[in-house]
Curated annotation (Swiss-Prot):
The record marks Y12, Q70, E154 as: Important for substrate specificity. Keywords: Cytoplasm, Hydrolase, Nucleotide metabolism. Nucleoside triphosphate pyrophosphatase that hydrolyzes 7-methyl-GTP (m(7)GTP). May have a dual role in cell division arrest and in preventing the incorporation of modified nucleotides into cellular nucleic acids. It is found in: Cytoplasm. It catalyses: N(7)-methyl-GTP + H2O = N(7)-methyl-GMP + diphosphate + H(+). Transmembrane segments: none annotated. NCBIfam families: maf. The active site is at D69. CDD domains: Maf. It comes from Yersinia pseudotuberculosis serotype I (strain IP32953). Belongs to the Maf family. YceF subfamily. This is 7-methyl-GTP pyrophosphatase. GO terms for molecular function: nucleoside triphosphate diphosphatase activity.
Length: 198
């Protein structure tokens, strides 16, 4: 089995990939994540997921490299990680009572034969109407500065929602495992037939 490389330093993506019980390593890709002018969210996340995987290709021949990138769209505008409290407040104020769509790009690059598979998964988050006290209380408790959309759905962020809609809930956290499993099987790596990590 070719070794897997997760082109990410995200602890969330690492924890998701561990669910598949396959051996893998992580490495930080050097990529410019600046959106191109007028670039749609779907194209942006697919381009960045591919760029992350390809950034590590020279270091990992004969490997399967997984790249992923995520943005959310609030009121038609691409939104990324807030990085600070004031931006997170604005993002949650904009999301209050709205449907926010998350776009997660996923790439699997086989450096042995240079084949590449790329897709985009979407996931809709319907926010309930939030008071300023709820927004402040949430942000002070969870501090989601490195999370697109300013929340952690796997934590207290679940209290912000009215409902969720999408094919794979892992997509919302940053790594679409259903799509990734399909890509891995196409490359001859089936999580159910490979010896699991102990």
């Amino acid at each position: 089995m070719p070794q897997l490389v997760l082109a990410s330093t995200s602890s969330y993506r690492r924890a998701l990939l561990e669910k598949l019980q396959l051996p893998f390593i992580t490495d930080a890709p050097e990529t410019d994540e600046t959106p191109h002018a007028g670039e749609p969210a779907e194209a942006l996340v697919q381009r960045l997921a591919s760029a992350k995987a390809q950034a590590l290709a020279g270091r990992y021949p004969q490997h399967l490299i997984i790249g992923s990138d995520q943005v959310c769209v609030i009121d038609g505008k691409i939104t990324g990680k807030p990085l600070q409290y004031s931006t997170a407040v604005k993002q949650l104020q904009q999301a209050s009572g709205q449907c926010v769509t998350f776009y997660t790009g996923l790439t699997l690059l086989n450096t042995a034969n240079n084949s590449i598979n790329c897709t985009c998964e979407t996931f809709d988050v319907y926010f309930r109407t939030l008071s300023q006290a709820e927004i402040d209380g949430y942000l002070l408790r969870e501090q989601p500065w490195n999370c697109a959309g300013s929340f952690k759905s796997e934590g207290l962020g679940i209290t912000l929602f009215e409902r969720l809609a999408g094919r794979d809930p892992n997509t919302l956290i940053g790594l679409p495992l259903i799509a990734l499993t399909q890509m891995l099987i196409e490359q001859g790596v089936n999580p159910l037939t490979v010896k699991p990590v102990e």
